A protein has these predicted regions:
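Intrinsically disordered, polar/acidic, low-complexity terminal segments
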Residues: 2-58, 62-90, 97-111, 197-201, ...
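Hydrophobic alpha-helical membrane-interfacial segments at the cytosolic entry of transmembrane helices
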Residues: 21-26, 195-218, 313
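Juxtamembrane "helix-exit" motif on the non-cytosolic side of transmembrane helices
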Residues: 36-43, 116-125, 187, 217-225, ...
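Membrane-interface micro-motifs in multi-pass membrane enzymes
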Residues: 57, 61, 84-86, 105-148, ...
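Membrane-interface transmembrane helices that cradle and orient dolichyl/undecaprenyl
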Residues: 140-154, 186-192
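Membrane-interface alpha helices of multi-pass inner-membrane proteins
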Residues: 153-170, 174-175, 180
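Perimembrane helix-loop-helix junctions
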Residues: 174-209
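Membrane-interface helix-loop-helix junctions at transmembrane boundaries of multi-pass membrane enzymes
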Residues: 196-197, 285-316
Length: 531
């Protein structure tokens, strides 16, 4: 058989819904995130990581270094974007298989929603890790997909989940959410029995627990071999001193509240919800509930009491599964990036639409328009929110570039300055000097998404000048910066941009941006020495 025939045979073996999910994800992702892939607009963390080996064992991410090798440890927007969408597209294909989505249209919608969900936009502001993070999502989906295929698959799934968490722990919530959806699907499948569904549930619990245990065991090995301790990133260091079990009920309640706020409370913290999205989510809730009710009634499935009760239980647990990052990191507030698992709520609607497609033709006629309006409105919101995020970030970059270009022109114009001379920038850019005036930017405001300027800390000024403007100026050590800030002549200097705020002193140029120097935290210092 020729290679062309083998290729066609392989293509025919892939179900249309899986193909639609993959290409729906790839196409939608390219269209929605095109600006991020054709520009370089990372957040403040990305300023120092145009090239970075991503040695993040100190934050519990022991596999991130190896996964980041896929894009050569370098921020290359289009390459990173394509790799990310390829991994996400494969995840979409696995998810449609896991949830038994056999409609090509719904498969394509699943892929589109996975690619357009705004939490992914925040991920692409961390472009230096985006391919690795999307690989983590793929591994999380693979873990559940494998577990569904038997106990041997569960063992392999545990290994996949450990690798996923080794890239980023937050994506364990993706696996948990998908596991809940897999059980929900079984409650609506006439051929599934209570015993089989219990077996699947136990297998999924085993896979999730074994994967988390394996992740932690490997982490301990890495810490031992590298002679490291966990940093205070998201409370990871507290993990070694025990989990706050007394706080567990509060954390569970917080996770559920965060999920409710994310979808139904405009202006909620670490979210981007608007009144428009609330309407979209209410429509999703109505469509999903109607599909669930009609499916139970159509096959008289409601007569088997475990099916409606099991479905309600999975729906009740889904907010906790999506918000599991709060349980995993009890001392931190999950960021929008960490809430990617919330896309599972929309996948649940797609799952229920697929089951609703199995009801009578008259009922499908009622469902179709509402489902189409919901899908179109959701994708429109995602398109606008992602690009609002990118527009705000790009403006912050332009503002920072302009400001620091003018700032260094003042340095070069300082009497006595010579190329290669040390430059001490004491303080950060004053907030009142750079401030975005566009009201819509407030929707996507978060510390991980620059809105006013990118160089929010003293060290970011050096990173921007050196790695973004190619100006060879090195950051001074902490003791030097502290000693400069304590001198009488520095205290007498006016603040930038006033005349005299850039001056030659003690053989170096000093720029006074703030009245005092803010020392780096212990976390920052330890983070810079990570390995």
């Amino acid at each position: 058989m020729s290679i062309d025939k083998r290729g066609r045979e392989l293509w025919r073996r892939i179900a249309p819904a899986r193909r639609a999910a993959f290409f729906g994800c790839l196409t939608t992702g390219l269209l929605v995130h095109l600006y991020a892939f054709t520009n370089l607009i990372p957040n403040s963390d990305g300023l120092s990581r145009v090239y970075d080996l991503q040695q993040m064992t100190v934050s519990g991410r022991w596999f991130l270094h190896y996964a980041s090798a896929l894009n050569n440890f370098t921020q290359m927007p289009m390459a990173a974007g394509l790799l990310s969408l390829l991994f996400l597209g494969l995840a979409a294909a696995l998810i449609t298989s896991l949830l038994d989505i056999h409609s090509a249209l719904l498969g394509g919608l699943s892929g589109a929603v996975l690619a357009a969900f705004p939490c992914l936009g925040y991920t692409f502001l961390y472009l230096f890790t985006a391919p690795a993070y999307c690989l983590s999502i793929l591994l999380a989906a693979l873990a559940v997909w494998l577990a569904k295929r038997g106990w041997a698959g569960g063992l392999l799934g545990a290994a996949a989940l450990a690798l996923s968490m080794g890239i980023y722990q937050a994506y364990a919530s993706v696996a948990i959410s998908l596991a809940l959806l897999a059980v929900l699907k079984e409650t609506l499948a006439p051929q599934a029995s209570l015993r089989e569904t219990w077996g699947l549930g136990l297998r999924l619990v085993f896979t999730l627990a074994a994967g988390a245990a394996l992740y932690y065991a490997v982490l301990l090995v890495f810490l031992k071999v590298k002679n490291l301790e966990l940093l205070s990133y998201l409370g990871m260091d507290a993990a070694s001193s025990g989990y706050p079990l007394k706080e567990l009920p509060r954390l569970v309640l917080d996770a559920c509240k965060q999920a409710a706020s994310f979808f139904f409370r405009p202006g909620a913290a670490n979210a981007f919800t608007t009144p428009f999205l609330v309407l979209v989510d209410l429509l999703a809730l109505a469509v999903g509930a109607l599909c669930w009710f009609l499916r139970l009634r159509a096959g008289a499935l409601w007569r088997e009491l475990w099916r409606p009760l099991g479905g309600l239980a999975m729906a009740a647990l889904l907010p906790l599964g999506m918000g599991f990052s709060q349980i995993l990191s009890p001392y931190a507030q999950p960021t929008p990036l960490m809430k990617y698992a919330y896309v599972s709520a929309y996948l649940a609607v797609v799952l229920l639409l697929q089951r609703g497609d199995e009801v009578s033709a008259r009922e499908r006629v009622l469902l179709a328009p509402a489902a189409a309006v919901w899908a179109a409105a959701l994708l429109l919101f995602c398109l606008n929110t992602n690009n609002l995020l990118y527009t705000a970030s790009a403006q912050a970059h332009r503002a920072t570039e302009s400001y620091l270009t003018r700032l260094f022109a003042r340095v070069e114009g300082c009497p006595g300055y010579e190329p290669g001379m040390e430059v001490a920038f004491v303080g950060a850019i004053a907030q009142e000097q750079l401030r975005a005036q566009i009201p819509s930017y407030a929707q996507v405001d978060h510390y991980s998404a620059p809105r006013d300027n990118v160089a929010v800390l003293n060290k970011h000024i050096y990173h921007y000048l050196r790695d973004w403007l190619n100006i060879p100026v090195e950051e001074l050590d902490e003791e030097t910066m502290k000693s400069i800030a304590q001198t009488a002549w520095f205290k007498a200097m006016p603040l930038y941009p006033a005349p005299g705020s850039v001056a030659l002193a003690e053989g170096r140029v000093v720029v006074k941006l703030q009245e005092e120097y803010t020392p780096k935290s212990d976390f920052e210092i330890a983070y810079e020495d990570r390995r």
